[in-house]
Amino acid sequence: MKELIICNNIKLIKEEIHKKKIEISKRNNKEYYEIKVGFVPTMGYLHSGHISLVERAKLENDIVVVSIFVNPTQFNANEDLSSYPSDIENDSKLLKNVGTDLLFLPTPDIMYPKESGYSTFVTVESMEQVMEGKSRPGHFRGVATIVTKLLLITTPTNLYIGQKDAMQCICIKRLVADLNIDTNVIICNTIREDTGLAKSSRNSYLSNEEQIQASSIYKILESFKNNINSFTDRQSFINEITKQLEQNPLFKVEYVSIASNITGLEIIDQFPPPKDSNLSLALLFFAEKRKTRLIDIIIL
């Protein structure tokens, strides 16, 4: 089994990527610049959705780098930063089992050094206007900043992210294009439980019974997608989705969005919307142990 090299600082991860490139270049008689690096950024507590990204990265690259970093700047004050699930030991085993080359495991002080008076952030301005951005002020500034930093550190050929976080996908594609970062952003299909519930580290907050209840989210979205032509206008469509979801008294819908899959902005003036638009939502599930925020998306 391939050794997983764990790097907990920036200098080390850069050195290890460089060493791997030289090694592969010599072994396979390839030019250094031809060596492809696949990168999967995560916040840890890995599940089969994350692993599917790593497996695809392995198929398409010479070197696979995964990062685990619970990024504090993308959490608001009332969110779950302090309680976000973590199991580095198990994550490392999973990554080793699928043949990951390098694991970048920085601390907040490494990514946001306080002693230097850290004050630089990346803002994709359009993301403040999307529904998820309005619902979580400052979230996308945190996402854009950490992803930019990770890309500058790892300089990957390809970056792999899951479609479930649709607005993050749009944000990252925009920043890579606008900042002329030489990385391909590859969006991978959402991985779901057999029940339809989208895989998420936050599902660990829910009991088995609550996860079954949460699986109704995807089923309701699919049902409305299949019946969209029976509605005459956008607002009645959204209202009915909200109404059906909130038949479960433990669900409180934050928003239902019909948006462009390119900009993330709401499609107001066309219904039914163009093919491949995003139908997404966020809701609060008032579960027994804690309030849990769930998101999901399907492509229309």
From Swiss-Prot:
UniProt keywords, alphabetically: ATP-binding, Cytoplasm, Ligase, Nucleotide-binding, Pantothenate biosynthesis
GO cellular component term of the entry, any: cytosol
Cysteines engaged in disulfide bonds, as pairs: none
Reaction catalysis annotation: (R)-pantoate + beta-alanine + ATP = (R)-pantothenate + AMP + diphosphate + H(+)
Active site: 50
GO molecular function, one term: ATP binding
Gene Ontology BP, a term: pantothenate biosynthetic process
Residues binding ATP: 43-50, 162-165, 191, 199-202
Location(s), subcellular: Cytoplasm
Pathway field: Cofactor biosynthesis; (R)-pantothenate biosynthesis; (R)-pantothenate from (R)-pantoate and beta-alanine: step 1/1
One matching Pfam family: Pantoate_ligase
List of residues binding beta-alanine: 74
Positions of (R)-pantoate binding: 74, 168
Subunit structure: Homodimer.
Any further remark recorded for this protein: The reaction proceeds by a bi uni uni bi ping pong mechanism.
Role: Catalyzes the condensation of pantoate with beta-alanine in an ATP-dependent reaction via a pantoyl-adenylate intermediate.
PANTHER family: CYTIDYLATE KINASE/PANTOATE-BETA-ALANINE LIGASE, PANTOATE--BETA-ALANINE LIGASE
Protein name in UniProt: Pantoate--beta-alanine ligase
Organism for this UniProt entry: Dictyostelium discoideum (Social amoeba)
